[in-house]
């Protein structure tokens, strides 16, 4: 979709989902507009559900998940918002997501999945290509990214 404001055309991407398990519930975000003195509010996934959906994808798809953005998102969101993650909510969101997707059986084998992902030369090659395309990821080693994902999983599994 493209938007036009004052003759400037800007591409706009939206991500609309239905039927997902938002756990424990959606949250309202307020965004201050840059060109007007007001804010808009939207309902969106809570942080734990965003993380759970990406984490479940890594666990269930292992090396068939070639979308490096998922790996980057898991790393950067844990770095930027790690202190605000509620472990019980992350655990509940991960279980709800896996149940909705029919992948609950894979959760117990997550540590092995992370090992496989990290050791796979093709995955690391895809990561290097992602780094070249997106400079914000240039200084992040594949090991660092996968270790962040392991840490999130451990947080979700903490009792």
Where are these regions (language model features)?
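Structured mid-to-C-terminal alpha-helical surface segments
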Residues: 1-159
């Amino acid at each position: 979709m493209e938007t036009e404001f004052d003759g400037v055309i800007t591409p706009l991407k939206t991500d609309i989902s239905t039927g997902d398990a938002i756990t424990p519930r959606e949250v309202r975000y307020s965004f201050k507009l840059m060109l007007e003195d007001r804010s808009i509010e939207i309902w969106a996934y809570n942080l734990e559900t965003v993380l759970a959906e990406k984490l479940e994808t890594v666990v269930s798809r292992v090396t068939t998940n070639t979308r490096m953005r998922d790996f980057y998102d898991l790393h950067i969101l844990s770095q930027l918002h790690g202190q605000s993650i509620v472990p019980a909510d992350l655990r509940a969101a991960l279980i709800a997501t896996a149940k909705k997707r029919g992948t609950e059986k894979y959760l117990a084998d997550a540590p092995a999945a992370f090992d496989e992902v990290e050791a796979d030369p093709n995955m690391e090659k895809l990561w290097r290509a992602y780094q070249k395309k997106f400079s914000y990821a240039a200084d992040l080693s594949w090991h660092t990214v996968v270790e962040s994902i392991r840490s999130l999983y451990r947080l979700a599994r903490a009792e």
